[in-house]
Amino acid sequence: MNGNELASELTRAFPGAPGDLHRLHARLAAAAQRDGILDVAYRTVDSPVGPLLLAATEAGLVRVAYASEDHDAVLQALADRISPRVLDSPTRLDAAARELGVYFTGRRHSFDLPLDWRLSAGFRRAVLSHLTEIGYGHTASYAAVARLAGNPKAVRAAATACATNPLPVIVPCHRVIYSDGRIGRYLGGPDAKRALLALEAAA
């Protein structure tokens, strides 16, 4: 049972005031973490590019997902790939939510969050690990990123790595475009990518 299913069950079992349900859920989440039965915590946050799902393990932030990816499908994928012990636990992601909030005001240019890279491997991981070298307000080409990752000929693979980045916004794949200026693929869609580039260009 994931966090959404648990919340539905709690609502049916305890049809009291929303505040009571929220406090009960918070206690259950804290107990699950204390007892080692919470492997993936998640929450959603509003943003100028739509609601974002944030998910974290003990190692750090493991997933950021746009609404267009279907948050329920993302949670199921996390349950399949990491652990079925997934729970809506907002406090575990307070720091990430705060940093994203400041980023979207234009006052934060980088993130200081521990990251869990387990959803990336090989050349894809190498590509993503270099993206923070692209400065805020700047862009780089897929060809340049392929060179940074150690394989100048792997431009298409670099583009695929950026397009499937499990940590968009935090790991700034939106700063990578084609050499001819085309925007390229993006998990959140082209409008979200343009919005992030415009935000950074204006700061």
Which functions belong to the PLM regions below?
Residues M1-P152, A201-A203:
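Basic nucleic-acid-binding alpha-helical/helix-turn surface characteristic of O6-alkylguanine DNA
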Residues K153-A195:
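Short glycine/serine-rich loop segments
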